[in-house]
């Protein structure tokens, strides 16, 4: 039995986590394999848009004889109330529109 401690990443964001992730799922998987991991969890923010990439690339590696196990995941969020969340989101959207309108009506002096 080996004394080597195995590591598996259980929290990774790809390009499908806007503003927070880098690389496509297959890039993450290749990096994991190159660094001795035999599994990796892809946990993008609120979506599983990278799932097909993850599945196809994992199957490709398995056909090549690599023992890699994809872990399918998602980073989810808990909210107290859908109604309250909708109100807060509407207020944020309203403020964004008002701010954009102000910016468009502002004169720029150089």
Language model features: what each stretch is:
Residues 1-110:
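Phosphodiester-processing cores and adjacent nucleic acid-binding clamps
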């Amino acid at each position: 039995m080996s004394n080597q401690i195995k590591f598996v990443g259980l929290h990774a964001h790809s390009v499908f986590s806007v503003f927070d992730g880098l690389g496509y799922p297959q890039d993450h998987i290749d990096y994991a394999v190159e660094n001795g991991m035999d599994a990796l969890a892809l946990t993008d923010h609120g979506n599983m848009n990278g799932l097909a990439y993850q599945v196809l690339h994992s199957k490709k590696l398995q056909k090549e004889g690599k023992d890699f196990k994809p872990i399918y995941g998602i980073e989810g969020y808990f909210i107290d109330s859908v109604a309250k969340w909708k109100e807060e989101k509407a207020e944020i959207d309203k403020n964004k529109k008002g701010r954009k309108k102000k910016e468009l009506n502002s004169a720029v002096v150089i």
